Amino acid sequence: MQGFPRITVDICEKYRYNLSMLYNYHTHTKRCKHAEGKDKKYVEQAIKAGLKTLGFSDHAPYLFPNTDYYSTYRMEVDELHEYARSIRALKKEYAKDIEILCGFELEYYPKFHAREMEFLNQVNPDYLIMGQHFIGNELSLLYAPRQSEDNMLEAYVSQVLEGLATGHFLYLAHPDLPGFRFSKEAVEREYTRLCEGAKKLNIPLEINLLGIRENRPYPSRKFFEIAARVGNSVVLGIDAHDPSHLRDSYPERLAENMINDLGLHLIEEKLL
């Protein structure tokens, strides 16, 4: 990982203290098929960590018209209402201890977006965050981190900015997900365009703590050097896929070190 020391289990155990951050809007549930733990356990760990707001934002069920495509990393369409009921029941149960919000992490697929918003609005979500994993849409199988052609990075940035311009998204999760397998010129040009576009729209960029925890290529210091130069605001997103992630403060400390080194503006107050 660029800019971060490798994290081991021993290090994570050593730094399992309360978090400095008070608001987290990036939390998954087992419905997405790659997270663990009951919804209630996430809430209990968030309270122990000292969070004031826990936003659930599981991978939204997506309506793909006229296709047999099956997603292996998001909740099922028929789980939409059960998810919302579960999160809002916890919101009521723990109202004296923590604010709980019901949201979704969602890709922007231009051809399907209007229909998808109509579908999700059945449960009146509190917010959406954009987590753009595919270029075009999932049916194209163009998974962003596996691309290396410059035109693919250009397409990713254009699609993200078009989605952010809808005004439907609270912030952009893991903005540097495509990585750096492109030419240096394309990386500088397109990530600058992404940062400038997000700043113009006043949309924060997420420093993804799961990426630090799992030693992924993101968040990248190289990307956030560009964000610092452009003047973007950033937020921390735990991207919790297990209740224990909400008590793991070591990735947060590493992220804060980078923020201070680069002079980034960290939004520490509530976004909603």
Place the predicted regions along the sequence by residue.
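Mid-to-C-terminal alpha-helical segments outside catalytic/metal-binding sites
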Residues: 249-272
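Hydrophobic alpha-helical segments and helix pairs
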Residues: 98-143
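An N-terminally biased module of ancient metal coordination in phosphate/nucleic-acid-related enzymes
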Residues: 13-110, 120, 181-195, 202, ...
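Domain-core and long-helix interface of multi-subunit machines
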Residues: 129-230
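Short amphipathic alpha-helices and their capping/turn segments at secondary-structure boundaries
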Residues: 39-52, 111-125, 156-167, 193-196, ...
